[in-house]
Amino acid sequence: MANDQEMSGWTDLLHSSSKLLEQAAPSSQFPPLQRNLDQLEALSKKLKAKTLRNEAPSQSIAATRLLAREGINAEQLARDLKSFELKTTFEDVFPAEATSVEEYLQQVHEMAMVSAIQEAQKDNVRSFNDYMMKVLEEDWRKEKRDFLQSLSRISMLPKTNMIDTSREAHAGQLVPVGSSPRVSSTPGKELVALANIPIHEKKAYVYGEVVKKLNTSRERGMPFRPAMCFKDAYDTLGAEVTRGKSVNMQKIWQLVQAITGEDSAVRQGVSKRMALAIGARHHLQHGHEKFIMDTIQTHPTQAALGGSVGNLQRIRAFLRIRLRDYGVLDFDSTDARRQPPVDTTWQQIYFCLRTGYYEEAREIARSTRSSQQFAPLLTEWITTDGMVAAESAAIASEECEKMLRMGDRLGRTAYDKKKLLLYTIISGSRRQIERILRDLSTLFNTIEDFLWFKLSCIRDVTGGSSSVVLNDGLAPYSLDDLQAYLNKFEPSYYTKNGKDPLVYPYVLLLSVQLLPAIMHLSKEAGDGGYNIDAVHIAISLVDHSVLSEGSGTGHKLSVMDSNAEASSMIRQYGSMFLHHGDLQMTVEYYAQAAATVGGGQLAWSGRSNVDQQRQRNLMLKQLLTEILLRERGIYFLLGARGSGEEGQLGRFFPDSRLRQQFLVEAAHQCQEAGLYDKSIELQKRVGAFSAALETINKCLSEAICSLARGRLDGESRTSGLILAGNDILETYKYYPEVSLQERERVMEQETILRELEAILSIHKLGRLGNHLDALREIAKLPFLHLDPRMPDATADVFQSASPYFQTCVPDLLKVALTCLDNVPDTDGSIRAMRSKIAGFLASNTHRNWPRDLYEKVARSF
């Protein structure tokens, strides 16, 4: 209905407009226009847009006035609205069908989970990228630091004075880093200079001083304690950062000093390997004594030590602190009618032994009724350094069995655990020890307590733990058993994944695995310079000839193998000084490397076996030759003159005959390596003048050939060789002892030198264009007989010439032919000389002359 009315309205309007159009008279001023509906719509929109533009300023002014009235900056608002963010609506995220609460919550849950997963993925990727970048930067910094340290590890070390090569030069003071050579070097100033350099360079310096003193003492047959001196040198470096670490390098040096026996008397009646274990046990006892004193000082009131300073009083003060929660102790009890005090007999004996107070332990065992049966066993163990008789061990083992059976029936509180440990130590039974470790693993608070117990139990078993059996059929506990048990665990178990890096080598040293400990230290990464410590620990152990005793279980190396490993390490360390030009420190460490394969201290005095002495001499010659080949090496080892009396070589080869033999061999090696200058110098130093001249003639012959082929440096090379030859001949004149045979050889080589010198002058004349003079000199040469006035020579004459002379002949003949081509033949002598040359070549065809020489002869005719 409504549509019909609307249509009728539009019809009436159209009818009215048609009538108006008919009534309108045409005008020339306004021509008629006809538009359809689409055109009218477009024109109306255009008109409306013009109207809106006219109305906009008034509306904008009104809007700005309204915003200002509300305190809003219209310009700021307009700038902010230039950028806007389109956010999704709920209709975009959730479907229209999700109208119930359950479906809505399900959708929210799913969206939250997806968003959480996506955010977690982004966080993981970002964290991974950050971590990888951090690791990459750390690795790069470490690589850069290690590389720079490898380049400059010794660069800041003091350099020796290479000018002073007297016999005492090796014992002189070194100039500290950064100090002037004119300032006297005092220990205080050295420490000040060392304070500003890295720890590994400090160690290298102070240890190097000890090595020089060690070598000097061994050369002179004087006593020296290397481990103690290395430890003292390390102590001068100042405080070491040991926060959170149970073992530092000072502790390891103390252990090395203990196991080598430098701080105690020589142990008789036990093997060298067992003596090392006893030394390790004594080190742990000294450490426990320090622990007791620190505990007493930390708890002075509970210790109640008073004015007593005896060893037994210290042990009782320590027990007052340790057993403070158990009540009154027996040694403090004054009223027997009150509650019975705590019996500490076995505690006192155990801690006296643990601290090394043997006399006090025996006194308590004898004076107490409950331990009187144990007293004779303890006395025997102390007297024999743990090597009790089999009968005593069987008695102690039986007592252990009784206590363990009692514990099985009545509980573990039925016996004193310290009593069980003490009887187990006396028994030395492997079965008892393994049972204690299995059933009573919490007996030991620290690894030091555990290792002290194990070291106290071991027996000196030769050939392995299975070769000796006690009377009751129980096998004794041996050092091999201890090493095998400790080696079950990875190094990271001891070092807490690298947080305490020195614990593992400390455990290896305590269990007399000396070579594995050194090898582990030498490979320990970090800025502590532990590889330097490893080298000097090896020097200390080898000097005492004990390194071969500590190859460890599974590393059954011979004496030579163990010493060779250490020698290689010392040699490699010494070569670092060689690369930096410090020849003084190089020779000190090379001497130690050679002494290491020779058996340590015994090698210096010649008391090692024949094979070790041979190995030492071979390595010493090899290493000294290596120094000779370096720049200033000859001057350093031999001095300004002579064959080593004034240099460092005299330290190692006091016999002049051995020195001469070594230098002749070194000169031969130099010649094989092409180091002719050094070979000539060495031959001259030992008085082998003919050999030196022969080397010069060989080099001069090669230089003349190079010069003839146009080599630029040939002339300077030949001039230097001729000067060197003349210098040798001048020295030869004043040499005191020259044999007749040597004189003849020198004269022969001098003749060859003059012949080569003449050939060189002919080449120079030819280059300068003095062809006639060159031909005259050629005619004078022996063995060729090219003078036209002389008869032809036979082939045998040329064969008797020096090979160095023969080498120069082809180039010489080419020069002669060139000169002949440039000199006019006025009397036929030129043609005669050409014929002589052709005849010479024909009579020596077996020489295989160069093809171009034959061609040049053919062209000349």
Swiss-Prot record:
An annotated GO cellular component: nuclear envelope
Lineage top rank: taxon: Eukaryota
Keywords: mRNA transport, Nuclear pore complex, Nucleus, Protein transport, Translocation, Transport
GO BP: mRNA transport; protein transport
Subcellular compartments: Nucleus envelope; Nucleus, Nuclear pore complex
Signal sequence annotation: none
An MF annotation (GO) of this entry: structural constituent of nuclear pore
Parts of the chain that traverse the membrane: none
Similarity comment: Belongs to the nucleoporin interacting component (NIC) family.
Quaternary context: Part of the nuclear pore complex (NPC). The NPC has an eight-fold symmetrical structure comprising a central transport channel and two rings, the cytoplasmic and nuclear rings, to which eight filaments are attached. The cytoplasmic filaments have loose ends, while the nuclear filaments are joined in a distal ring, forming a nuclear basket. NPCs are highly dynamic in configuration and composition, and can be devided in 3 subcomplexes, the NUP62 subcomplex, the NUP107-160 subcomplex and the NUP93 subcomplex, containing approximately 30 different nucleoporin proteins.
PANTHER family: NUCLEAR PORE COMPLEX PROTEIN NUP93 NUCLEOPORIN NUP93 DEAD EYE PROTEIN, NUCLEAR PORE COMPLEX PROTEIN NUP93A
Stated name of the protein: Nuclear pore complex protein NUP93A
